[in-house]
Regions:
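N-terminal export signals
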Residues: 5-25
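Secreted/extracellular ectodomain signature
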Residues: 8, 25-131
């Protein structure tokens, strides 16, 4: 009986000695810095587009536009990430090209998935022209 209590006490103390330093070393989550082009941004939004459906393209552009209106261009950092068939939004020939250009002038960033570009280039032998 005494051995059991001694063993339980030893295991409990060992656990505390192991866990306590780990708890003491955990840091508070890092607060991300605003993008350099939006130093006063208070809101950060990422929108994704993975379809070349015009309805979805218009919806993403509309959401970005509404966010700019709601928060103001200097208070919100918006990034639209296109991958897969969604990269069609950023082609010169896309019907919404003028809307994309307008959002870019208001500070919205548009990024294209590099893996998508690499895959298209590998399959077709030509890298798509994205602006």
């Amino acid at each position: 009986m005494n051995r059991r209590r001694l063993l339980q006490g030893f295991l409990g103390a060992s656990a505390m000695l192991t866990v306590a330093p780990a708890l003491a070393q955990t840091e508070a989550p890092a607060i991300s810095k605003p993008p350099e082009d939006k130093p006063f941004a208070e809101h950060f939004v990422a929108l994704q587009l993975s379809d070349s459906d015009p309805k979805k393209e218009r919806l993403v552009l509309s959401v970005a536009s509404n966010l700019l209106k709601a928060y103001g261009a200097d208070k919100v950092a918006i990034e639209v990430v296109a991958f897969g068939p969604g990269i069609d939004l950023l082609r010169e020939t896309n019907e919404f090209r003028s809307l994309v250009d307008s959002l870019v002038t208001q500070g919205v960033r548009f990024d294209v998935c590099g893996n998508t570009l690499d895959t298209i280039e590998r399959e077709t032998g030509k890298r798509p022209a994205i602006n």
